[in-house]
Amino acid sequence: MIPMEELKVKKITNGTVIDHIDAGKALMVFKVLNVPKETSVMIAINVPSKKKGKKDILKIEGIELKKEDVDKISLISPDVTINIIRNGKVVEKLKPQIPDEIEGTLKCTNPNCITNKEKVRGKFKIESKNPLKIRCYYCEKFLNEVIFE
């Protein structure tokens, strides 16, 4: 049997590294960020982690996340660490927190909600962070799944 070689992923010079993503959720995180298609992205899925057993990692060259993006990530995988990289150095480490309220970003799962019938931006209250329970401000229904706009 041929021994497996360790695959090393190149460091990024400027951009964002999202580490400690729950295993199997990197593609979901990538999708909600709407990264331009010409952007260099590295995704590692189910890599060994001392803290979690397995984790995913996402490296995005040339893009620093906005607060709205960080909020989205916190709803998918709340224990991530986000590192902002400039000139090859970590200049900022972010530990996202699930916000108490969310405006926009999410879509109500109730087909009868006003947000699904008219041009009204969704507004939501986080009732519980663990387990995650989100209530629509307008129809007061709990979301049965997280759907991003």
From Swiss-Prot:
Entry cofactors: Zn(2+)
Keywords: Metal-binding, Pyrimidine biosynthesis, Zinc
InterPro entries named among the record's database cross-references: Asp_carbamoyltransf_reg_N (IPR020545), Asp_carbamoylTrfase_reg (IPR002801), Asp_carbamoyltrfase_reg_C (IPR020542), Asp_carbatrfase_reg_C_sf (IPR036792), Asp_carbatrfase_reg_N_sf (IPR036793)
Pfam families (alphabetical): PyrI (PF01948), PyrI_C (PF02748)
Cofactor note: Binds 1 zinc ion per subunit.
GO annotation (BP), single: 'de novo' pyrimidine nucleobase biosynthetic process
Any single Gene Ontology cellular-component annotation: aspartate carbamoyltransferase complex
Highest taxon, organism lineage: Archaea
Positions bound to Zn(2+): 108, 113, 136, 139
The UniProt record lists the keyword Metal-binding: yes
One term of GO molecular function: metal ion binding
Quaternary structure annotation from Swiss-Prot or TrEMBL: Heterododecamer (2C3:3R2) of six catalytic PyrB chains organized as two trimers (C3), and six regulatory PyrI chains organized as three dimers (R2).
PANTHER family: ASPARTATE CARBAMOYLTRANSFERASE REGULATORY CHAIN (PTHR35805:SF1)
Family as reported in the entry's similarity comment: Belongs to the PyrI family.
Stated role: Involved in allosteric regulation of aspartate carbamoyltransferase.
Entry protein name: Aspartate carbamoyltransferase regulatory chain
Source species: Methanocaldococcus jannaschii (strain ATCC 43067 / DSM 2661 / JAL-1 / JCM 10045 / NBRC 100440)
Name of the gene encoding the protein in the UniProt record: pyrI
